């Protein structure tokens, strides 16, 4: 993950996007990775491990997270502002800050009520990544949460395909008729610019997507390799 710096505000990488100069470093690449992993563990998966309490909508007090990082990760230097800067510059829009609170916007494996997320500006069509082997069963049975507590959808074919590459070599993309779902009373929530959440998708709203050619950026290739290599080590 790129380092976190500040100049005309916080940013990821070396050069300030405003003036082009290298700003003051807030976290190096290793620290960004470590803090990001800890945030994910607390806000998405296992807050009790770190003695953090989430409210019903998944929010935790930032001060409590700072205490965890100082106590358990040896980051005596970390402050409230470091967490704010990390959340503000997260390239995938994973976090939402509300005053002194922070939450993850998606990716939960623990029950969290995200029904306060916006329901406006939902695209008519959304996309879901599967595999060629599983797609026929998915179209017959519908889509339900598996390792997460919400079904995650993408706003574009490309985003869905790239997301799938973190898990399998050749994702098979399904097209979701989001407009018909909403018209029939199903709730779909917008958790970021290109990620949408719902509880389940009945089979009548699912069909094969028209294949599109997807070319990965070098940054995407590196990030996919990093995640897949880590997953192999963790197995």
From Swiss-Prot:
Gene3D superfamilies in alphabetical order: 3.20.170.30, RNA 2'-phosphotransferase, Tpt1/KptA family, N-terminal domain
Ranges of Acidic residues composition bias in the record: 208-222
Disulfide bonds: none
GO MF annotations, alphabetized: NAD+ poly-ADP-ribosyltransferase activity; tRNA 2'-phosphotransferase activity
Keywords: NAD, Transferase
Region ranges (Disordered): 208-235
Pfam families membership: PTS_2-RNA
Enzyme Commission identifier(s): 2.7.1.-
Residue ranges, compositional bias (Basic and acidic residues): 223-235
GO biological process terms held by the UniProt record: tRNA splicing, via endonucleolytic cleavage and ligation
Family listed: Belongs to the KptA/TPT1 family.
Chain's role: Removes the 2'-phosphate from RNA via an intermediate in which the phosphate is ADP-ribosylated by NAD followed by a presumed transesterification to release the RNA and generate ADP-ribose 1''-2''-cyclic phosphate (APPR>P). May function as an ADP-ribosylase.
Protein name, entry field: Probable RNA 2'-phosphotransferase
Taxonomic source organism: Thermoplasma acidophilum (strain ATCC 25905 / DSM 1728 / JCM 9062 / NBRC 15155 / AMRC-C165)
Gene: kptA
